[in-house]
Amino acid sequence: MPDSELKGFATADGRKLSYRKLGTGPVLVCHPGGPGLSPAYLGDLAGLWTRFTLIILNPRGTGASDRPADPHAYHFDDYTSDLEELRQHLGLEQIMLLGYSHGGVVAQVYAAARPERVRRLVLAVTTARLGPEQQAATQAAIEKRSGQPWFEDANAAGQEEDPETDDQIRDQVFRRMPFNFARFGPAEAAYLDTWRSEPINGDALRVFSEEVPSLDLRSRLANITAPTLVITGLEDYVCGPVCAAELTAAIPGAREVIVADAGHMVVVEQPLSFHDEVAAFLTS
């Protein structure tokens, strides 16, 4: 992986918003998920830097991006406002945009509200809502993993009371992390260790938890005009094929790709498939 360059700029309200720039070629703006996590977990985005100039945003309150003064300022409209300021900072009339997980929800909101600003859109392991169908699929995926040695602790972590401090939240998040993989073994545990020490922003997670029950973007998706790729892992326990199918049906002309033997961390579980599918779509 080439050396990356950490860059930043001042937002209209005086915060520093930072991003990592690496690679060469057409610009691909990447909004990671979490929320509240830095994009360190995405690594080099499956080597897409070999084909594109990656602009990997540190969302507000993560990495080298300042936290807003208001601890509640982590709503989707807040994130899309930052994304628009990033586009303006880059001096681009249109952007190719990849949103991953929570970042995929941000990307949907942005592309639906500003369709003229998005040239191509990649929605990776994300969803338009977490309704009954999605919740049922998640529960089935959790039960499918019940025989794993890590299951008891990971499942318990998801049922405990909400922790208070950022460190407690990070501990809970990492205990539950094995669910994000189709297979969780020593290699996956070693990968988690590479970013286990990254700070986590509990405020962002708390706001997201409040928004989830009412999240439903289906009525907005017809406004998206950019060619769109919807990609997820076959074994993704939270944003899997059920979520992908709903997105694909609602976004005009969207293309769907389901990656076998991959969960929510498809970008690191099946990097070659992820790279090839995304690169082929963006250059087609």
Task: Identify the function of each model-found stretch.
Residues E235-C239:
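Acidic catalytic loop of the alpha/beta-hydrolase fold
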Residues I224, V230-T232:
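Short beta-strand/loop motif that positions the catalytic acidic residue
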Residues E93-A137:
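Conserved hydrolase catalytic core segment
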Residues P59-H102, D276:
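Active-site loop/oxyanion-hole signature of alpha/beta-hydrolase fold enzymes
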Residues G8-H72:
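Conserved HGGG/HGGXW glycine-rich cap/lid loop of the alpha/beta-hydrolase fold
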Residues A254-S284:
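Catalytic active-site module of serine/aspartate enzymes centered on a nucleophile-bearing elbow/loop
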Residues W150-S219, A226:
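Alpha/beta-hydrolase
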Residues L121-E160:
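Flexible "cap/lid" loop of the alpha/beta hydrolase fold
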